[in-house]
């Protein structure tokens, strides 16, 4: 039987696996993912299916835009997953397979997959959707992103909003709970994007001031 790790133990493992400084703007993301993944790993009803994998990889990619150095991003995800008992490469593969399986399906076809879901008879479907999986905000984002892949055209955002909420009950979750987590995700993403823009502006201003100081100190000027 696998030993259950505490959040503190998971964080200690993370720092061993990722011996670098996490920039301040990304620390909250790392902490929250470690806590949530640690809790999910200890839930008997939880399955790391395609919807979960899509949600986790999407959250990580969305919230680490602008992360520097770029070559540490993969190591960061691996460390977050490893310290909580998951495999980053495995989840990325599951997410890829789930996206391929869902590609081209409309909302009604996805509903049929959920309704007909049976692990023994449809293993490939089970990897995409595990109905009544233990709920988490990561799965909420996975549902949202799954539907977003099917939406297109000028009203893509509106179509996604309507369709993902229509799909929620089929997963066995309440609309209010999922909508709250998706809205929080969007709000948090907007805040971090603005924070990154501000950081970039400050960096440019500092470079400009340094250049001006160097120019003023040159002989004959």
UniProtKB/Swiss-Prot annotation:
What Pfam families does this protein map onto? ThylakoidFormat
Superkingdom per UniProt: Bacteria
| UniProtKB keywords | Coiled coil
Q: Which GO terms describe its biological process?
A: photosystem II assembly
Q: Name one GO cellular component term.
A: plasma membrane-derived thylakoid photosystem II
Coiled-coil region(s): 174-213
- Record-stated family: Belongs to the THF1 family.
Its biological purpose is as follows: May be involved in photosynthetic membrane biogenesis.
Specify the protein name. Answer: Protein Thf1
Q: Which organism is it from?
A: Prochlorococcus marinus (strain MIT 9211)
* Gene name, Swiss-Prot/TrEMBL: thf1
